[in-house]
């Protein structure tokens, strides 16, 4: 507020990833320069010089105001640093990513039950404050952290073919198959205690469709045909459930259903973007035309309702009446 920014690590690393990936694709040097600036910001301000890892949030003077080590945030750091390494060839970026990976494995991996604890204090000691945001449950493990850690480890393994990393990536995939994906409904369970006992009943359609393609991406890289076929079947089933329950007649994917089954008809930008990718992936895996049609309708919805034709960029969300909103109130 008052034009005094509070840099958030999650946003800074996403900016880094976006411009690095854009340069990788289009070779526009302006994109690489933007990525370089974001990389310098991550290294100079967000990386903890004493304990390693990245801070969650800084004030406008680059002083930590939340120095906790949220594993969700560490995952985005790995993801973006590896992408920058791939785009620029900067060996230091990969070294930073590997350092964060080793800290996560040392401090937040659960050797008894597998999976990862949500957060830690600045010095990586255990913490009781586990929430990613005010609307999240204060539980030991979450779908969202494991999803983005799987995404980050997939990208890291693409660049760094290490047996230990492969073992952890397989373990993450199995966490989804064994615990996080409900085998009956094909929806995700969002929160758990330390021993993987479910603690929530909401359905998050955006995360469902996002997981469907990220799970597939991870297993394709692992070159395990049996695991890949199993995940491909699960991936298509998840996309099928989302298509049957969550897509409005105009192609918008509703945000979620609460524990009572009541839908939130808002359409968030990231949910809609993930639906394009997820339904396209389901079509590639199954050949079923309804998935391709859903992907096209999802993009048409973006073009009609979410792209700001006057000021550029996208609206954060539109409501059930398709009125736009710029309020960002939840993490994806």
Regions found by a protein language model. Name each.
Residues 1-332:
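Glycan-recognition and catalytic cores of secretory/periplasmic carbohydrate-active enzymes
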């Amino acid at each position: 507020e008052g034009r005094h920014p509070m840099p958030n690590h999650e946003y800074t690393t996403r900016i880094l990833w976006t411009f690095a990936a854009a340069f990788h694709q289009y070779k526009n040097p302006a994109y690489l320069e933007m990525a370089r600036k974001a990389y310098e910001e991550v290294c100079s301000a967000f990386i903890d010089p004493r304990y390693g890892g990245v801070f969650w949030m800084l004030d406008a003077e680059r002083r930590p105001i939340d120095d906790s080590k949220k594993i969700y945030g560490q995952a985005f750091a790995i993801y973006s640093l590896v992408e920058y390494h791939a785009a620029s060839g900067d060996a230091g970026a990969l070294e930073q990513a590997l350092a964060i990976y080793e800290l996560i494995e040392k401090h937040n991996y659960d050797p008894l039950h597998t999976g990862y604890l949500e957060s830690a204090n600045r010095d990586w000691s255990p913490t009781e404050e586990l929430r990613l945001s005010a609307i999240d449950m204060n539980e030991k493990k979450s779908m969202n952290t494991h999803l983005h850690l799987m995404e980050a480890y997939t990208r890291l393994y693409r660049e760094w073919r290490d047996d230990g990393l492969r073992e952890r990536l397989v373990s993450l995939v199995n966490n989804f198959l064994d615990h996080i994906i409900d085998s009956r409904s094909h929806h995700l369970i969002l929160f758990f205690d330390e021993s993987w006992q479910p603690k929530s009943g909401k359905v998050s359609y955006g995360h469902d469709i996002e997981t469907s393609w990220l799970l597939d991406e991870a297993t394709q890289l692992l070159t395990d045909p049996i695991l890949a076929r199993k995940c491909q079947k699960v991936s298509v089933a998840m996309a099928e459930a989302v298509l049957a329950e969550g897509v409005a007649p105009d192609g918008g994917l509703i945000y979620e259903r609460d524990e009572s089954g009541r839908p939130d008809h808002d359409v968030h930008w990231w949910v809609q973007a993930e639906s394009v990718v997820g339904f396209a992936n389901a079509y590639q895996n199954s050949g079923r035309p309804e998935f391709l049609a859903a992907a096209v309708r999802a993009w048409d919805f973006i073009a009609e309702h979410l792209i700001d034709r006057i000021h550029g960029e996208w609206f954060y969300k539109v409501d059930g009446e398709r009125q736009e909103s710029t309020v960002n109130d939840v993490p994806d």
